[in-house]
């Protein structure tokens, strides 16, 4: 049985081209630390080895270790886990100018679990909801619960 989170992720992957047209979607997905093999949203640039949000080399390519430091400062567990998995250098965490320096063991404690917080769940729902046609949005407004809303969103995107 597929979880609601996995279904939402599958929907985001399926409709990634449409979703990535909107810059606010990229910010939310970046904050959630979401990426996938072969259908990356966070891609490593083939030319410079940095992270690219578009998959193409540009002046906006971001150093993966800078993203790791930013993720640690913001205590974004999912992003830390994602960036370490993509090959970020863990030794860069010692360059933080914070009073609390994290060791590798403390950093590994930040790694994400499979659960998703309500805030992250709402962010995914927001991405899906904002991309729907007006007719479907009117029907979804009748949903009373978050589970009902997400269910309706997923049905709307999976429908032929």
Swiss-Prot record:
It comes from the Viruses. Plays a role in virus cell tropism, and may be required for efficient virus replication in macrophages. Belongs to the asfivirus MGF 300 family. This is Protein MGF 300-2R. The lineage of its organism: Viruses, Varidnaviria, Bamfordvirae, Nucleocytoviricota, Pokkesviricetes.
């Amino acid at each position: 049985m597929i979880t609601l989170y996995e279904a939402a992720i599958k929907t985001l992957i399926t409709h990634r081209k449409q979703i990535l047209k909107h810059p606010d979607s990229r910010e939310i997905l970046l904050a959630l630390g979401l990426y996938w093999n072969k259908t990356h949203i966070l891609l490593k640039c083939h030319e410079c080895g940095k992270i690219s949000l578009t998959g193409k080399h540009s002046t906006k390519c971001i150093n993966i270790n800078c993203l790791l430091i930013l993720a640690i400062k913001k205590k974004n567990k999912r992003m830390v886990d994602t960036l370490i998995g993509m090959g970020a250098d863990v030794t860069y965490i010692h360059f933080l100018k914070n009073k609390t320096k994290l060791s590798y063991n403390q950093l590994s404690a930040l790694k994400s679990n499979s659960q998703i917080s309500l805030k992250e769940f709402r962010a995914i729902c927001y991405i899906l909801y904002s991309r729907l046609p007006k007719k479907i949005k009117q029907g979804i407004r009748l949903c009373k619960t978050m589970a009902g809303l997400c269910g309706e969103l997923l049905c709307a995107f999976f429908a032929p």
